[in-house]
């Protein structure tokens, strides 16, 4: 399966039991910042933004004072899982980032999708990739 198929079929799909509810944007990005696959709506990001995200995975709390920046959007960092998941909130939407051995799985959402639904979609794919050694 191509990386784009993972984004299209496992991240940008309808959320179980909620037809028509789906993430706003999603991507799989290598630890080096190279985009493996992304939805058409995923924001163009700066290398320093990806560096900040990777630093927060290695040093949890790094982004808390400044917020998580991705493209033109600033998210307030909320409780995640140290070294494994970063979660951010902005208004009625937010972001979940799951770290795997080689990649970061991004999901961005707006209402009516809930934070928990975004977490489920992103973390399920991230856990699968971890199980595959990726």
From Swiss-Prot:
Under CDD domains, the record lists: PROF
Q: Where does the protein principally reside? A: cytoplasm
Q: Between which residues do disulfide bridges form?
A: 13-118
Task: Using the record's annotations, give every residue carrying the modification Phosphothreonine.
Answer: 114
Motif Involved in PIP2 interaction — list its residue ranges: 84-100
Keywords associated with the record:
Actin-binding, Allergen, Cytoplasm, Cytoskeleton, Disulfide bond, Phosphoprotein
Record bears the keyword Phosphoprotein: yes
Matching Gene3D superfamilies, A to Z?
Dynein light chain 2a, cytoplasmic
GO cellular component terms attached to this protein's record: cell cortex; cytoskeleton
Task: Summarize the PTM comment.
Answer: Phosphorylated by MAP kinases.
From the Swiss-Prot or TrEMBL record, state where the protein is found: Cytoplasm, Cytoskeleton
The terms under GO molecular function for this entry are: actin monomer binding
Q: What else is known?
A: The variability of the residues taking part of IgE-binding epitopes might be responsible of the difference in cross-reactivity among olive pollen cultivars, and between distantly related pollen species, leading to a variable range of allergy reactions among atopic patients.
**Could you give the subunit structure recorded for this chain?**
Occurs in many kinds of cells as a complex with monomeric actin in a 1:1 ratio.
Q: Which PANTHER family match?
A: PROFILIN, PROFILIN-5
Annotated family: Belongs to the profilin family.
Question: What task does this protein carry out?
Answer: Binds to actin and affects the structure of the cytoskeleton. At high concentrations, profilin prevents the polymerization of actin, whereas it enhances it at low concentrations.
The name of this protein is Profilin-3
Give the species: Olea europaea
């Amino acid at each position: 399966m191509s990386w784009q198929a993972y984004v299209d079929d496992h991240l940008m799909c309808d959320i179980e039991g909620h037809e028509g509810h789906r993430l706003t944007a999603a991507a799989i990005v290598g630890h080096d910042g190279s985009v493996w696959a992304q939805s058409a709506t995923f924001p163009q990001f700066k290398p320093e933004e990806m560096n900040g995200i990777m630093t927060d995975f290695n040093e949890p709390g790094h982004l808390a004072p400044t917020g998580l920046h991705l493209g033109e959007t600033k998210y307030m960092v909320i409780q995640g899982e140290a070294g494994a998941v970063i979660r951010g909130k902005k208004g009625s939407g937010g972001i979940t980032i799951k770290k795997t051995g080689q990649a970061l799985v991004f999901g961005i959402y707006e209402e009516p999708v809930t934070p928990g639904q975004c977490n489920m979609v992103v973390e399920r794919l991230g856990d699968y990739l971890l199980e595959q050694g990726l």
